[in-house]
Amino acid sequence: MVHPVQVGKRTRMSFSRLKEVGQMPNLIEVQLDSYDWFLKEGLQEVFDDINPIQDYTGNLNLEFVGYKLDLDSIKYSVEECKERDSTYAAPLKVKVRLLNKETGEIKEQEVFMGDFPLMTEQGTFIINGAERVIVSQLVRSPGVYYDMTVDKTGSKLFSATVIPNRGAWLEYETDSNNIIYVRIDKTRKLPITILARALGYGTDAEIIEFFGEDERLKATIEKDNTKTREEALLEIYKRLRPGEPPTVDSAESLIESLFFDAKRYDLSRVGRYKFNKKLAIHLRITNQIADQDIVNPQTGEILVQKGEKIDKDKAIEIQNCGINEVYIKIDDKSFKVIGNHFVDIHSLVPFDISDLNIKEYVFYPVLKEILDNYADEESIKEEIRKNIYRLIPKHIIREDIYATINYELALSYDIGYKDDIDHLGNRRLRSVGELLQNQFRIGLSRMERVVKERMTIQDQEVITPQALINIRPVAASIKEFFGSSQLSQFMDQTNPLSELTHKRRLSALGPGGLSRERAGFEVRDVHHSHYGRMCPIETPEGPNIGLINSLATFAKVNEYGFIETPYRRIDPKNKRATNDIVYMTADEEDLYVIARSDEPIDENGYFIDDKVTVRAKEEVLVVPVSEVEYMDISPRQLVSVATAMIPFLENDDASRALMGSNMQRQAVPLLKPQAPIVGTGIEYKAATDSGVLPKAKNAGTVVYVSADEIRVRRDSDGGIDKYKLLKFKRSNQGTCINQRPIVSKGEVVAKETLLADGPSTDLGEIALGKNILMGFITWEGYNYEDAMLISEQLVKEDVFTSIHIEEYEAEARDTKLGPEEITRDIPNVGEEALKDIDERGIIRIGAEVRSGDILVGKVTPKGETELTAEERLLRAIFGEKAREVRDTSLRVPHGEAGIIVDVKIFTRENGDELPPGVNKLVRCYIAQKRKISVGDKMAGRHGNKGVISRVLPEEDMPFLPDGRPLQICLNPLGVPSRMNIGQVLEVHLGLAASKLGWHIATPVFDGAIESDIVDCLRKAGYSEDGKTVLYDGRTGEPFDNRVTVGYMYILKLAHLVDDKIHARSTGPYSLVTQQPLGGKAQFGGQRFGEMEVWALEAYGAAHTLQEILTVKSDDVVGRVKTYEAIVKGENIPEPGVPESFKVLIKELQALCLDVKVLNDDNQEIKLKESVDEDADELEVNIEGTENQPEEKEEKEKEDSDEYDDLREEDVEPDLEELSLDDLDLDDFGDEH
C-alpha cells in the first residue's frame, strides 16, 4: 500500500511494493574511478612498458624511476580556470635515472613532463576554460572469436579471428574443400599448416602427431607445398615482406617480433583473461567421454578412466594438475583436445600467496620449473615475482596459437561454441583512464625515438637526463586528445540531468571503434546481455541510434572494462533469497537462471509460488523454484537514470519512452524550479550525484547563510568550512547556473548533506519542469497535430520563464599597420550610440542593449594610401591623429538583445595570459529573460512533445466546475496512436495527489497500478474515471462530454523560438555561385528549392519566378540596381543574367566545349564579367559578402556529438563561402 518515504527534505508517498536490497552506486563513479586508476596504476604501467630506453650500442640506459603529480603547485582553481580560459592541470614530475654502463656512472634528475589535466570532483575536465567530458568507448575486447557460416551445400564452415590489443591479427577460415587457411596481419591467406610448421612442427608426421588425426588437417597438408620448417618460414616471409630477399634468419626474427615481442604485440590484461577463458581445456572436455585413462602426472593416480564421462569438477582438476592434452571419444572416433597450458596458481602452490595479488591463470611450464627448482616459501614467492611476465605473458605464445588451431578443428565435432560479437561479454568499455593511458603511451613512444637519437648524437660524458628528454611529443599528444579527440566532448550542461547522462554515456564511435556508415543493424540492436548493463531505451534518434548508449542505473565497470550488474544470491540449500549481492559480467550471467525482482517472496525471502518466471540467456522461462540461482535486485536496474525518471514507463510504448528520456535532457532550467508531483523516487539521487549541488564536506552547524555564501562550523575541530555559491553563471549551453541556499542559520548538518539548490533542482530533487493543470480537449483546431494551447497565466506569472546568458568577446590585436585600440573615440558614431559606453570604451553593467548596439568600441588602423595635397596639409596641421582608422567595434549580433550582467577585462599589464598578438580582451555577458511564447517547444515526460500555437487569455480557457481555468489544452488524439498511456495515468494520479497535498513516488515497473489510482481519486473526492465536466470560457456553456483533467509535469525544451526566428533583406553571398548563404549563423536567406520552383511554374507565376531566380538571388548587377531603385523609389529594372548561369557556361568550357550565348538573330551576347562601376554609390554592400557572424555556439556544436538534427547545408559554410573581406580587393568599391 502507499507509504511515506523521506527523500532529502521532502516526504514522498511511495507506491513501490518491493524492498530494495543494495544501494545504487555513485552515478559518476565510471569517470572518477577510471581517472583514479590512471593516476595510481595506469601511468606507472606506461613507464614500465617503455623502461629502459637504450641507445643503439646498449651503453646508455635511461629509466623512469617514479613520478608524482604536484598537486600543491596548481596555478588556478577550477573557477579561475573557467574565467581565464586556462586548463585545470597539475605539473607531472618524473624521476629519471641515466646509467652509463662503460663508466658505471649514474645520474638522477627530476624532469618536468608537462602539465597534466586534472579531473574535477564532478568528473569533468577544464580545457582552455571550457568544461569537457571524456565519453567512455565500447570496443570489441581482445580475444579469440569463432564464427560459423553455412555454404551452398549446407556444410558448416568455421572461421576464427585472434584480436590483440595492439599487434598483428590472425584470421582462420575454412573453405568448402575443408582446407583451413590463415591470414597473418590481413595479408593473403596461407594453408594453416605453414604457420604450424614455422612455429616448430616442421614435418607432416609431427603435425599429425601433435594435432591428432583429422580430415581437414590432412586436406590442408595436401594443399600445403612446403614440407619443412625452413620452407614454411620463407613462404611466410615472402607473403609478409614481398620484394625483400627471404632468409631463414630474417624470417625467424620477423615471426618473433610479430607475435612474441611484448613491445610489438600486446594482449593487455583483458586479452590474456579472455584467451585463458576461451582456450582453457576444462571447458571443452566437460561432459565428454574420455578415450584414454587420464593420469595425474605428479601423483600417478588415475583421475578419469577410459570410457568415463568427465564432469565439471574433474575437468578443472585435470587442467590444474598441468594436463594439456586429452583424448575424448566422439561418434566412435578419438579426438585430441589441446589447451593453452594455463592453470590456476592457487591450486598448485601449497601455501597462501594472496599477497602476490595474482588473479589470472599462469603458464604451467614456467610455474613447474619454479616449483621443481625451489622448495622454501620465500624463494618461490621471490621467483614468482621475478618471472611474473613469463608466468602471465603480455603477448601471445606458441601454446595459445596451437590451442586456437585445435579449437578450430574441434568446432566441427561440436566441441566448443561460436561467439556472438555483440554480446556484452565480448565488448568492453575504455573509460577516461584507459583512453588517456593509450594517448600517453603514444606520446612516450614518440619521445623514445627522440631520446635514442639524442643519445647517439650527444657527448656521452656530459649528457644529462634533462638534456635527453624532450617533453613536446608527450604534451602534444595529451593536448590533442583533450582538444580534438572524438571522445572528448563539450559538456552538455543544459540541466543537471543532461550533465549526468553525458558522463554516463557509452559510445561505440571514435578512434578504434565503429563508424556510423559501417555499423550494421546487429551492432545497434538491443541484446539480451544489455539487461542491467546498458539501457535498452535511451539512445539518440537518427544516424547514431544504438551506437551511443547509456549506462544502466546499477551497473558498474570491472577491472577488465566489462560492465557488471548486481544480483541477489538465492541460497542453494533452502532456496531463499538472501541479501548477498553479487556483481556479474554478461558471460558469467549466462551460466545462471535468474528470477525477476518482483517475483513474490515472503518476509523471510522464500518464494510464494512453486513456479517462477526466470531469464536464462535470451530465453524467458517458467521453472520450478528449485532451479532458481539468482534474482534481480531492483526493477529499475535495466534502465538508465533518465529513463528511470519517467513515471508509468511500463505503460508507454518504447519509441515514445526513448523520446521522453532524450527530451528530459533538453529541458531548460526555469526561474522557479518545481519538483514533480508524480515522480519516480530517483530524482534526489540523480541531482545529488550530478555534481551541481554543494554538499557539506564535514558534519557541523551552519553559522552563516547569504545568497552567495554558506559557512559551517565543523564538529570535529571547530574550524569553519566556507562554501561559495554560483550566482547567475553561464553554462556551456547558455542556460543560467544559479545556486540558492536551502539550509538556515543554526541548522545542524551531517556530512554529505545538501546545502543549496542548483539549476533545475528543488529541495535536492531534479526539477526540470512544472506541474500544470491540463485537460485533454481540442479547442478550435489550435491543438491540431500536437500543437499546444496555453493560458496567458503561464506568461504573466513567469511559470515557464527562463534566463539565458550569452557571452561576446572582443580582442585588441597587433596588426601590421599598428595595434588595434579599445576606445570610446570611434569615427562616424554619434553620441546617442555611445550613451552607455564608459570612458574606456566598454559598455556599463546594467545597460539594456538591442541588436546593432556597441558593446566594445574598437578601432583598427587603415592601410596608408597616397595622400592628396589637402590631406598632407591636414596632417601637417593636426599631426599624426588624423591617421585613418576604421571602426571594428563589437556590436550585438542581429536578433539578439538583453541586459549586460557582467564585463570582464583581461590585459597583459594585469599579468593575464593572453594568446600571442592580443593586447587586451574584453568579455561581455548579456542576459535575457525569455517568457514562454508561440513557437516554443514543450514536452511531457512520455515523448508527448508539441509546439505552442496560441496563448489564450485566462478568461477564454475552458474552466473546471470550481472555476479554475485550465493552463494547457492538449489534443486527445495524441494518445491512442502513440500508445504512451503513461501520460494519462500521470494526469489522474497528479489530480488526486495535488488535492491530497502529496508528492508521489511511483518507481518504474514497480509503481501505482490502476486500483491504486482509483483509490487515490476516491480519497480525494473525485470521480473514479478521473473525468469532469468542463465549461467553455467564452460562453460559460459546458462542453458536450466529460473531459480528463489533471496535473501533468511539463518541460520547456531548449528549442526556443527566439533562437530560431531569422529574417534577412541583404547579406552575405557565396563566392562562386553568388547565391545567398543559408542558415541563421551565416545570416543566410531562405532557400527556394527545385520543388518550390515547380510550384510557381505550375501556376504560371512568371514574374515572381523570374524575380526569385535573378534579382533576389544571384544576378549581381540586377540586385544592386534593384536595391537602388527601391531606395530611390523608382521602378525595378529588367533582370540580368544569373551568376550560376555563367558558372555553368564556365564549367562546360572547362570540359572543352565551346559554348556561346546567342540572341534571336544568332548574334553572340557578351556576358558582363563584373558590376557596373556606377552601381556602387549606395552605402550598402550587395555584391560582396559581409563578414559572417561566427557564433561561438556553432563551434561548440561541432565539438559535441549532438549534431543529429543539423542538415548538411546548415553546417558547411564551405571554402567557397569565405567572405570577400578576407580577399585583398582594395579597388573593390568603398570600405563599408
Curated annotation (Swiss-Prot):
Cellular component terms per the entry's GO annotation: DNA-directed RNA polymerase complex
Q: Which UniProt keywords apply?
A: DNA-directed RNA polymerase, Nucleotidyltransferase, Transcription, Transferase
Q: Please give the superkingdom of this protein's source.
A: Bacteria
* One GO molecular-function entry: ribonucleoside binding
- The protein depicted here goes by the name DNA-directed RNA polymerase subunit beta
Question: What family classification does the UniProt entry report for this protein?
Answer: Belongs to the RNA polymerase beta chain family.
Q: Can you state which reaction this protein catalyses?
A: RNA(n) + a ribonucleoside 5'-triphosphate = RNA(n+1) + diphosphate
GO aspect biological process, one term:
DNA-templated transcription
According to its UniProt entry, this protein's organism is: Clostridium botulinum (strain Hall / ATCC 3502 / NCTC 13319 / Type A)
Locations of Acidic residues compositional bias? Answer: 1171-1180, 1199-1232
Name the gene.
rpoB
The role this protein plays is: DNA-dependent RNA polymerase catalyzes the transcription of DNA into RNA using the four ribonucleoside triphosphates as substrates.
Q: Where is the composition biased (Basic and acidic residues)?
A: 1189-1198
Question: What EC number(s) are associated with this protein in UniProt?
Answer: 2.7.7.6
Subunit structure of this entry? The RNAP catalytic core consists of 2 alpha, 1 beta, 1 beta' and 1 omega subunit. When a sigma factor is associated with the core the holoenzyme is formed, which can initiate transcription.
Q: Where is this region: Disordered?
A: 1170-1232
- CDD domains linked to this entry: RNA_pol_B_RPB2 (cd00653)
InterPro entries reported for this sequence: DNA-dir_RNA_pol_bsu_ext_1_sf (IPR042107), DNA-dir_RNA_pol_bsu_external_1 (IPR019462), DNA-dir_RNA_pol_su2 (IPR015712), DNA-dir_RNAP_su2_dom (IPR007120), DNA-dir_RNAP_su2_hyb_sf (IPR037033), RNA_pol_bsu_bac (IPR010243), RNA_pol_bsu_CS (IPR007121), RNA_pol_bsu_protrusion (IPR007644)
